[in-house]
Each structure stands twice: as C-alpha cells, then as structure tokens.
C-alpha cells in the first residue's frame, strides 16, 4: 500500500504509523510545515486548489489567491515572532496526480539561539488548517466542532542530534481502528467559498489514499 502511494504521489511525503495491534494511521501529504538544514529553515505555504486539469487557472483566480495569501501571512507572522527575516519565492503550482495547489516556499536563516521545535510549535496549525488570526480561529473551532481531530493535521517527521529536521502536516490520511476505516481531508473556507466546490475539493484530496486502500 505504501509503495503504491509513493508511486502515485511522488511529490508527497508518505507515512505509516502502527499505534497498536488494531490501530493504524497513514497518509500521503504534500504540505511541508518546516525543514531545517543547518542554518536554513524552509516552510511552505500550500493553499488554493483546483482539479489538475484546471491547474492553469490557479494563479488567475482572485478567490484562490486570497485564500493562499492568508496562509502566507499567517506563516510570516509566526516567523516574525522569532525575529526571523523570511524570504518568499514567487507563487508556483504544485501538480499532483488529481489535484493542483498554489505553493509559496519561504526561507529564513536561523542560528543556535533558535530552537526549531519552538518554531514548529508556532507554525502548527497553519491558517490552512485553523484560520486567521490563529488564536481567534482556534477558539471558534473549539466552540463549534463537536469532535476531536485527533492526529489529523498534526506534525509528522524526524529530527536528528544536530536539530536538523523535517516535518509535514498529517493531512489526507486514513485511520484504521479494528474493522472501521476513517478518511480525513479538508478545504480552506473564506468569504467567497461555495460549499459544493469545497466538498468536491475534499473528495479529490482524500481520493489519493482512498483509492489505494480500496484496491
């Protein structure tokens, strides 16, 4: 199953975690939260989606650009709180098998005074997974969602003895609990969002793992 996910989604980070003998958590996520290599810190803003066949419309859609810019602003706010000076690449398109996203790569230089785990903690969840401003959005989520998100959208990755690390958001996932199977995916909702379009987007996102499990 993991081999198939890797083959079908080579631009995603594929993960699998056995929680116990009857519970498993797996997925294929394109969303890099943070990667530290020596003094370089990279994080990606990934927000704004269309079916892959309509990918060329992404950078000309004002609603999608607005959605993406909100996520960029949230990340910049977090990095600025550590007195970092983030540099933004130009908006680009990340093309996956059945869906495409706008991606902006953001790089910063850090030093030994910066604990990357503190930066990671500030970055999660990004505005794509919570909202903006984050503190107010999380309060609203707590008040209206009547279920726990569990491990969905949490950080998954690695860190070494030199504090180099790489973490992704655990999105587009499946949770297996005995004889029950749960799929997790989401979409960014802003003022001009249309419910049916957002639902269709979620369906496309979870299709990545759903189809492989059903094979």
Residue ranges and their predicted role:
Residues 1-66, 70, 163-186:
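An anion-binding catalytic pocket shared by soluble metabolic enzymes
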Residues 42-143, 211-214:
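Contiguous alpha-helical scaffold segments within structured protein domains
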Residues 18-25, 75-76, 91-98, 155-159:
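A glycine-rich phosphate-binding loop feature that marks nucleotide/adenosyl-phosphate handling sites
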Residues 105-215:
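Conserved hydrophobic core element of enzyme catalytic domains
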């Amino acid at each position: 199953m993991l081999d198939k996910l890797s083959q079908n989604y080579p631009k995603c980070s594929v993960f699998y975690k056995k929680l116990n003998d009857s519970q498993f958590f797996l997925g294929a996520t394109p969303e890099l939260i943070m990667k530290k290599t020596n003094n370089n810190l990279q994080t990606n803003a990934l927000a704004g989606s269309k079916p892959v066949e309509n990918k060329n419309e992404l950078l000309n859609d004002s609603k999608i650009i607005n959605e993406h810019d909100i996520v960029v602003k949230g990340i910049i706010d977090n990095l600025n709180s550590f007195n970092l000076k983030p540099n933004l690449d130009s908006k680009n398109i990340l093309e996956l098998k059945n869906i495409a996203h706008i991606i902006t790569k953001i790089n910063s230089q850090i030093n030994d005074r910066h604990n990357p785990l503190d930066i990671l903690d500030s970055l999660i969840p990004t505005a794509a997974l919570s909202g903006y401003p984050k503190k107010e959005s999380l309060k609203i989520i707590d008040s209206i969602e009547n279920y726990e998100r569990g491990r969905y959208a949490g950080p998954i990755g690695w860190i070494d003895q030199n504090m180099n690390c790489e973490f992704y958001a655990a999105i587009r996932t499946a949770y297996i609990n005995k004889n029950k199977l749960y799929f997790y995916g989401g979409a960014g909702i802003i003022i001009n969002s249309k419910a049916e379009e957002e639902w269709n987007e979620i369906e496309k996102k979870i299709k990545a793992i759903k189809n492989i499990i059903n094979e």
